[in-house]
């Protein structure tokens, strides 16, 4: 494989289903390597499977990259010198290359059926499941004529050199496949339609891709692609053979490969749950790579400055939801307050029942109260919904109420109500001062005992944003209405 200076990588998904975290991790590593080296990222779409491909999936892939802030230098939606960038629009190109390969003798027609191949293996005492036996590569003209007379339509196979295949993988180091494991393989169907095994390397060659970074599942196909590249170079279609790097599997629970059926595999599930792009990007980068042994939190600029495919680990990476959320929490805290406020407002409006017309100045305060208390944006709803719930609709959490609204809670509730009724200017400092005096100083209660019943009374929950600030946001009237209603339910009895 040639040594290259101007890095050109590609991301070439098929538009099926929703974006998978493993797929997006592959896109991220290609993008980060292109940006780190000052190279180019080519984004093309492999949409030749009419039965499975969809425009909805295509749009979802575009949305996923844009959500994460990954751009591309050439490709769909952008254009470039190697248009078109959708395989469904490149069929004439593939037919032309296939014809050149046929004319040069690099590929040949193969008429054998699968049953005939198995029978030949059995007759020779070999495992019948060994695969194709290269029988048709040297058919005589008479044999070809006989097959044609039967009405057989051949598939087209590439002549694989009889040699062992060795290369230095960018991730895995020295890799070797023995020659007997690599029979001649099909590059075009019997109807002349080129297969992925042909069109993918042809696109890479024509788009001058220098580094192929892809999933570990494609490792066994590399010898075939290396052989095809040699053939493409001989007919003048390819200039060089790219370097290959095979990225580690992403594993799910129980050390099984993360499948599309796993909820954790869907990028948009994480987005909809309130993972922010910075947190997702950071975590995806850790699925096979790390900045340093003692630093898990980093931004996109640090990723670009430090990412090298040579540092990617070959071992499988396990997807850990708790770690993703912990990293996301750090990135939420790193946001500027105004930025966080805007993102939270947009999220709450789209994904929750939080009203879009809630006063901006109050929302700014509420956002500040929860920024350090949530791991994902969706958690803000449970913390803030009490602010937009009608007083008469507030429901007390039974478990929390049973624990905190015992007979002993009547006294702090009465004292708290009396103290708050006397507050004239309804501000956090005044609320705090009044309650501290009435409950801590005068009654001698510990804060947890003093304020537990009040917190449940205004929010319905044992956990809420800071109590005094919450009361200010809620307003004096609603605060007192709720506390008096809570007093009427104390001691709290769980309904049968």
Curated annotation (Swiss-Prot):
<dbReference type="InterPro" id="IPR020752">
    <property type="entry name" value="Glu-tRNA-synth_I_codon-bd_sub1"/>
</dbReference>
<keyword id="KW-0547">Nucleotide-binding</keyword>
<dbReference type="InterPro" id="IPR045462">
    <property type="entry name" value="aa-tRNA-synth_I_cd-bd"/>
</dbReference>
<keyword id="KW-0067">ATP-binding</keyword>
<dbReference type="GO" id="GO:0008270">
    <property type="term" value="F:zinc ion binding"/>
</dbReference>
<dbReference type="Pfam" id="PF19269">
    <property type="entry name" value="Anticodon_2"/>
</dbReference>
<comment type="subunit">
    <text>Monomer.</text>
</comment>
<dbReference type="InterPro" id="IPR049940">
    <property type="entry name" value="GluQ/Sye"/>
</dbReference>
<feature type="short sequence motif" description="'HIGH' region">
    <location>
        <begin position="13"/>
        <end position="23"/>
    </location>
</feature>
<dbReference type="GO" id="GO:0006424">
    <property type="term" value="P:glutamyl-tRNA aminoacylation"/>
</dbReference>
<dbReference type="InterPro" id="IPR000924">
    <property type="entry name" value="Glu/Gln-tRNA-synth"/>
</dbReference>
<comment type="similarity">
    <text>Belongs to the class-I aminoacyl-tRNA synthetase family. Glutamate--tRNA ligase type 1 subfamily.</text>
</comment>
<dbReference type="Pfam" id="PF00749">
    <property type="entry name" value="tRNA-synt_1c"/>
</dbReference>
<dbReference type="InterPro" id="IPR008925">
    <property type="entry name" value="aa_tRNA-synth_I_cd-bd_sf"/>
</dbReference>
<comment type="function">
    <text>Catalyzes the attachment of glutamate to tRNA(Glu) in a two-step reaction: glutamate is first activated by ATP to form Glu-AMP and then transferred to the acceptor end of tRNA(Glu).</text>
</comment>
<dbReference type="InterPro" id="IPR014729">
    <property type="entry name" value="Rossmann-like_a/b/a_fold"/>
</dbReference>
<keyword id="KW-0648">Protein biosynthesis</keyword>
<dbReference type="GO" id="GO:0005829">
    <property type="term" value="C:cytosol"/>
</dbReference>
<dbReference type="GO" id="GO:0005524">
    <property type="term" value="F:ATP binding"/>
</dbReference>
<dbReference type="InterPro" id="IPR033910">
    <property type="entry name" value="GluRS_core"/>
</dbReference>
<feature type="short sequence motif" description="'KMSKS' region">
    <location>
        <begin position="257"/>
        <end position="261"/>
    </location>
</feature>
<keyword id="KW-0963">Cytoplasm</keyword>
<keyword id="KW-0030">Aminoacyl-tRNA synthetase</keyword>
<keyword id="KW-0436">Ligase</keyword>
<dbReference type="InterPro" id="IPR004527">
    <property type="entry name" value="Glu-tRNA-ligase_bac/mito"/>
</dbReference>
<dbReference type="InterPro" id="IPR020058">
    <property type="entry name" value="Glu/Gln-tRNA-synth_Ib_cat-dom"/>
</dbReference>
<feature type="binding site">
    <location>
        <position position="260"/>
    </location>
    <ligand>
        <name>ATP</name>
    </ligand>
</feature>
<dbReference type="GO" id="GO:0004818">
    <property type="term" value="F:glutamate-tRNA ligase activity"/>
</dbReference>
<dbReference type="GO" id="GO:0000049">
    <property type="term" value="F:tRNA binding"/>
</dbReference>
<protein>
    <recommendedName>
        <fullName>Glutamate--tRNA ligase</fullName>
        <ecNumber>6.1.1.17</ecNumber>
    </recommendedName>
</protein>
<dbReference type="InterPro" id="IPR020751">
    <property type="entry name" value="aa-tRNA-synth_I_codon-bd_sub2"/>
</dbReference>
């Amino acid at each position: 494989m040639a040594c290259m200076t101007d890095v050109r990588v590609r991301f070439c998904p098929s538009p099926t289903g929703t974006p998978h975290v493993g797929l997006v991790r592959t896109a991220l590593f290609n993008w980060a390597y292109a940006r780190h080296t000052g190279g180019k990222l080519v984004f093309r779409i492999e949409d030749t499977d009419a039965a499975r491909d969809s425009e909805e999936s295509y749009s979802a892939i575009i949305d996923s990259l844009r959500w994460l802030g990954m751009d591309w230098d050439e490709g769909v939606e952008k254009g470039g010198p190697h248009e078109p960038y959708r395989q469904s629009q490149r069929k004439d190109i593939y037919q032309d290359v296939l014809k050149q390969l046929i004319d040069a003798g690099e590929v040949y027609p193969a008429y054998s059926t699968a049953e005939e191949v198995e029978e030949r293996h059995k007759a020779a005492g070999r495992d019948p499941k060994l695969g194709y036996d290269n029988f048709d590569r040297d058919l005589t003209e008479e044999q070809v004529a006989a097959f044609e007379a039967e009405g057989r339509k051949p598939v087209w196979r590439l002549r694989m050199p009889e040699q062992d295949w060795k290369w230095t993988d960018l991730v895995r180091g020295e890799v070797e496949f023995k020659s007997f494991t690599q029979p001649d393989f099909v590059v075009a169907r019997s109807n002349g339609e080129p297969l992925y095994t042909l069109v993918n390397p042809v696109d890479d060659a024509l788009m001058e891709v220098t580094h192929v970074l892809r999933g570990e599942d494609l490792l066994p196909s590399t010898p075939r692609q290396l052989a095809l590249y040699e053939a493409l170079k001989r007919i003048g279609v390819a200039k060089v053979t790219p370097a290959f790097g095979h990225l580690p599997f992403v594993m799910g629970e129980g050390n099984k490969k993360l499948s599309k059926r796993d909820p954790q595999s869907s990028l948009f599930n994480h987005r909809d749950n309130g993972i922010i792009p910075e947190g997702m990007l950071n975590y995806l980068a850790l699925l096979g790579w790390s900045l340093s042994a003692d630093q898990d939190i980093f931004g996109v600029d640090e990723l670009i400055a430090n990412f090298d495919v040579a540092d990617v680990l070959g071992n499988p990476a396990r997807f850990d939801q708790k770690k993703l959320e912990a990293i996301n929490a750090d990135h939420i805290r790193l946001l500027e307050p105004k930025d966080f406020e805007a993102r939270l407002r947009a999220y709450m409006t789209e994904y929750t029942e939080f009203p879009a017309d809630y006063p901006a100045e109050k929302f700014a305060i509420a956002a500040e109260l929860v920024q350090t208390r949530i791991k994902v944006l969706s958690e803000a709803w449970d913390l803030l919904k009490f602010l937009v719930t009608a007083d008469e609709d507030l429901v007390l959490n039974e478990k929390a109420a049973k624990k905190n609204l015992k007979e002993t809670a009547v006294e702090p509730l009465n004292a708290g109500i009396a103290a708050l009724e006397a507050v004239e200017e309804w501000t956090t400092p005044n609320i705090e001062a009044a309650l501290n005096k009435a409950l801590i100083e005068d009654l001698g209660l510990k804060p947890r005992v003093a304020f537990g019943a009040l917190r449940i009374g205004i929010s319905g929950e044992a956990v809420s944003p800071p109590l005094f600030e919450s009361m200010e946001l809620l307003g004096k009237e609603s605060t007192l209405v709720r506390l008096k209603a809570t007093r009427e339910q104390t001691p709290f009895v769980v309904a049968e």
